[in-house]
């Protein structure tokens, strides 16, 4: 190797340093984006150490989704102000992406926790549980709405949760009023709800009261049978049903094969006779 290139990196050395394939360096040279500092007549190429920083900037922009054509314009006509503007712009995009990933992680962790709890649950059991007050995001009233408006109300609820970035991975639940339960109207929820994180104003919240609830389970959409068993349990213990029942899936079709294999949890308010 001649004296003038001993302090330079060969293409192979520079590609290893930058953790890319040699073909990437060849391609960048072909499109005029990034070229070796020295090109010999015999075809050998050499890169200087200070080119590493330039390549890092190219890699950074590429990782941020900037097209190579745009990167070329930035690199060739770069000024401190222009690069600073792009870096600040991309920094904002990264912050947004980080927040999105954090929310996704929260959603996934909730799904993991709920599924683990479901796998440890005896779905044939019925019990009384004292529950603390809990706040949910509530749909508009859906009782007796025409089918398309019923569906629209659910869509509105989901849209609001997404709009305010309140989703934590909890399932959509449904509320039956006492009158519906007594009349065995189990196919027409009064409201839908979702448990969400705090932080949004001017949205419709519902507070599930603290108190005693009968907790049972619905298997494969067999709603009427599930409520019959729970009500019998309540009455055998000298109690009566309260104002509302809250239903939400523990194992839905995301984790089981077929609707007939789904499991829903029912929380039915109870009170003394």
UniProtKB/Swiss-Prot annotation:
**Disulphide connectivity of cysteines:** none
DNA-binding region(s) from the entry: 11-30
Q: Which domain of life is it from?
A: Bacteria
Q: Which UniProt keywords apply?
A: Activator, DNA-binding, Transcription, Transcription regulation
Q: Any keyword Transcription?
A: yes
SUPFAM superfamilies assigned to the protein according to its UniProt record, in alphabetical order: Probable bacterial effector-binding domain, Putative DNA-binding domain
Enumerate the Gene Ontology biological process terms: regulation of DNA-templated transcription
Give start and end of each HTH merR-type domain: 8-77
A Gene Ontology molecular-function term? DNA-binding transcription factor activity
| PANTHER family hit by this protein | MULTIDRUG-EFFLUX TRANSPORTER 2 REGULATOR, REDOX-CYCLING DRUG-SENSING TRANSCRIPTIONAL ACTIVATOR SOXR
Q: What does this protein do?
A: Activates transcription of the blt gene in response to structurally dissimilar drugs.
The protein's name in its UniProt record: Multidrug-efflux transporter 2 regulator
